[in-house]
Amino acid sequence: MTDTRNGEDNGKLLYCSFCGKSQHEVRKLIAGPSVFICDECVDLCNDIIREEVQEAQAESSAHKLPSPKEISGILDQYVIGQERAKKVLAVAVYNHYKRLNQRDKKGDEVELGKSNILLIGPTGSGKTLLAETLARLLNVPFTIADATTLTEAGYVGEDVENIIQKLLQKCDYDVEKAQMGIVYIDEIDKISRKSDNPSITRDVSGEGVQQALLKLIEGTVASVPPQGGRKHPQQEFLQVDTRNILFICGGAFSGLEKVIQQRSTRGGIGFSAEVRSKEEGKKVGESLREVEPDDLVKFGLIPEFVGRLPVLATLDELDEAALIQILTEPKNALTKQYAKLFEMEGVDLEFRTDALKSVAKRALERKTGARGLRSILEGVLLDTMYEIPSQSEVSKVVIDESVIEGKSKPLYIYENSEPTAKAAPDA
């Protein structure tokens, strides 16, 4: 095979046998027995082969469903604590995709139902992270929707079918892939009924949205405009069957623990009164573990909606020790992320133990759980990240408790010199 660049052989102009471009229109023309191929067609062939290999790998990995123990083990690498929730999720997700792998087999008279999941836990306890990690592990399309932005059809706001549109966007509008995806609906507690008594007044963002979501979650054929276009009568829609999409709903459900305590301590004098005082002394997480479907109905979810979320998993409120673990142990721990950023500048970043404790305490005071850790560290390290790229002689930065509390600035250690601390800010 020969490489023809200018190809003035016999004064004849040469062309690519595949795309028809001349040798002057491409960078390189490769000659074979009576044929030529240009560099652009070679690149195109490589892309086609690469896509086919990736699709084959994705199909083979889809058939290799990890066991519940394996799923839980991978979740352990990213989510600290919440062992019960991880176990519940691992079993539910395993059974869901096992059901999908069985659905096309003939001769099986038992029809397996879908088990959607409801996650209940305080803000920043890991609900969204659990759902994200599951989708990444299973290599399926995943999208997050905020229930507070949803309204009934015909009202200003997001239509519930927009959720399916977002899922389609995640997989380049491949309907087959989307129908195997996972949807996480956050803040589901915010669309609860304002009271547990049915009302004749219109509740645009509450019960009405629950009714609309009900159809989507239990299984319907949603009509979605192609490539994100607006709906109009003459348009052809993509038809997406939601029967096999796994829906995971999550919410903090603030006040639900009181509903549970009222149920478990209803009435009572004498000895019962003593039991009631013990119930009231329970932590929120302990109370939430005793949740029953009737409690959710009392909270404001309609019975039909609760019935479509048969798998309940509760998450505990994170304490100081758990927050410190979150800062240091997971694969994507924040201290590891910031250390990597500093490493790119040739600088070591060290967090002292007292600094980690101080960060955890501040997050607890803000009641933001793990979600607030990044904003705390970002604020503490902002000035340092601003200065470091301009100071090539700095080899190490040390963060201690006084830095987190704003009493002093980080300790800078310079190459071939003694450690020096920046001057403390003016009081």
From Swiss-Prot:
**CDD domains reported for this sequence:** RecA-like_ClpX
Protein name as it appears in the record = ATP-dependent Clp protease ATP-binding subunit ClpX
The residues the record assigns to binding ATP are: 122-129
Which family is annotated? Belongs to the ClpX chaperone family.
GO terms for MF? ATP binding; ATP hydrolysis activity; ATP-dependent protein folding chaperone; protein dimerization activity; unfolded protein binding; zinc ion binding
Query: What is an annotated GO biological process for this record, any one?
Result: cell division
Q: Which UniProt keywords apply?
A: ATP-binding, Chaperone, Metal-binding, Nucleotide-binding, Zinc
UniProt cross-references to Pfam families, sorted A to Z: AAA_2, ClpB_D2-small, zf-C4_ClpX
User: What SMART domains has UniProt attached to this entry?
Assistant: AAA, ClpB_D2-small, zf-C4_ClpX
**Protein task:** ATP-dependent specificity component of the Clp protease. It directs the protease to specific substrates. Can perform chaperone functions in the absence of ClpP.
Its subunit composition reads: Component of the ClpX-ClpP complex. Forms a hexameric ring that, in the presence of ATP, binds to fourteen ClpP subunits assembled into a disk-like structure with a central cavity, resembling the structure of eukaryotic proteasomes.
Where in the numbering of this chain does the ClpX-type ZB domain appear?
4-57
